[in-house]
């Protein structure tokens, strides 16, 4: 099914015509919902601290999680105390849940587990992002909130919007779900503050982002170790764009004898992964690693990646954030 969807969205498969009526329904529902917020029939919850939303207008992976981690580190370097909220895709969260560094991906979602394991940032997940944000403000000392995804979650007021675009796949066939990958039309990009292009080449004022690989880490203990690149590996990925990962490790010189794709956010079966690593080491993404750390074997590895953006983006974001923070601080003091 996943391969068929990819062919429809990105390779011109004619089955898209069968799905276009459903895309029309999707457009109508999305349009009415947005109108309700635009004309005040529904109110977005405005928070007392700046809110940065990191999302995209397409379904599937585009580099949001590395971008969120980059923002956490950038804000900390400039004296901010960021916190993060997320929906926790792939899991059923009862109410809101604070994510701890040892949280299981099966309880809070793979991206939240990865983000907190990497950064120890205060983070709350929940189906209702407004409730998650309010809990974050109540229970933690934060002065800026980053929403991991949620560009289309208009109930949450936001001050800065960052949209990610996959620089290789772009917008596919330019159709709305389910005939294409779009959650909203391309017009939506005109209203965001920054469009970040993951993998380039950048177009129309987009900010170019590169994902730089770090040394491999062992899945079972999360520690960097020296991997013998003469050893063959089975590469697996359960992410939005697994081919990007497979291409990356091949370009890095790893001897890939087999690639295995899983659905995004899919829970892994211990025996299934063990069978893949009987004769070869198993190499996966960091997001996949957090889902199988409890039963990982000694020849399972993951490839960490770090987002790299230019200083012009850093300056523009920090400048805009400072203005928002000053305005909200003034309002809280009745100025």
From Swiss-Prot:
ATP binds at residues 58-65. GO terms for biological process: lipid A biosynthetic process; lipopolysaccharide core region biosynthetic process. It is an enzyme of class 2 (transferase). Its EC number is 2.7.1.130. Pfam families: LpxK (PF02606). Keywords: ATP-binding, Kinase, Lipid A biosynthesis, Lipid biosynthesis, Lipid metabolism, Nucleotide-binding, Transferase. Pathway: Glycolipid biosynthesis; lipid IV(A) biosynthesis; lipid IV(A) from (3R)-3-hydroxytetradecanoyl-[acyl-carrier-protein] and UDP-N-acetyl-alpha-D-glucosamine: step 6/6. One of its GO terms (cellular component) is plasma membrane. One of its GO terms (molecular function) is tetraacyldisaccharide 4'-kinase activity. InterPro entries: LpxK, P-loop_NTPase. It catalyses: a lipid A disaccharide + ATP = a lipid IVA + ADP + H(+). NCBIfam families: lpxK. Belongs to the LpxK family. Transfers the gamma-phosphate of ATP to the 4'-position of a tetraacyldisaccharide 1-phosphate intermediate (termed DS-1-P) to form tetraacyldisaccharide 1,4'-bis-phosphate (lipid IVA). PANTHER family: TETRAACYLDISACCHARIDE 4'-KINASE, TETRAACYLDISACCHARIDE 4'-KINASE, MITOCHONDRIAL-RELATED. This is Tetraacyldisaccharide 4'-kinase. It comes from Shewanella frigidimarina (strain NCIMB 400).
């Amino acid at each position: 099914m996943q391969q068929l969807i990819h062919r429809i969205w990105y390779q011109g498969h004619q089955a898209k015509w069968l799905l276009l009526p459903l895309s029309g329904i999707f457009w109508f529902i999305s349009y009415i919902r947005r109108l309700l917020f635009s004309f005040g029939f529904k109110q977005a919850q405005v928070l007392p601290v700046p809110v940065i939303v990191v999302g995209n207008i397409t379904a599937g992976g585009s580099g949001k999680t590395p971008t969120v981690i980059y923002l956490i580190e950038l804000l900390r370097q400039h004296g901010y105390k960021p916190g993060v909220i997320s929906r926790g895709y792939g899991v059923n969260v009862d109410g809101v849940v604070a994510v701890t560094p040892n949280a299981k991906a099966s309880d809070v979602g793979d991206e939240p587990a990865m983000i907190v394991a990497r950064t120890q940032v205060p983070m709350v997940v929940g189906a209702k992002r407004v409730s998650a944000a309010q809990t974050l403000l109540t229970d933690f000392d934060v002065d800026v909130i980053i929403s991991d995804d949620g560009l289309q979650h208009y109930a949450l007021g936001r001050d800065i919007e960052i949209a990610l675009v996959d620089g290789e796949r772009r917008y596919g066939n330019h159709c709305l779900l389910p005939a294409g990958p779009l959650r909203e039309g391309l017009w939506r990009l005109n209203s965001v503050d920054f469009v970040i292009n993951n993998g380039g080449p950048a177009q129309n004022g987009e900010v170019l982002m590169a994902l730089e690989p770090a040394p491999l880490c062992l899945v079972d203990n999360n520690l960097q170790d020296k991997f013998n690149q003469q050893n063959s590996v089975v590469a697996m990925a359960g992410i939005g764009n697994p081919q990007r990962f497979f291409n990356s490790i091949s370009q890095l010189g790893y001897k890939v004898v087999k690639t295995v794709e899983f659905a995004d956010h899919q829970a892994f079966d211990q025996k299934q992964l063990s069978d893949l690593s009987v004769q070869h080491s198993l190499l996966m993404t960091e997001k996949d690693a957090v889902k199988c750390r409890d039963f990982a074997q000694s020849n399972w590895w993951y490839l960490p990646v770090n987002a790299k953006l230019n200083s012009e983006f850093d300056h523009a974001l920090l400048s805009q954030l400072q203005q928002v923070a000053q305005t909200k601080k003034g309002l809280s003091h009745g100025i």
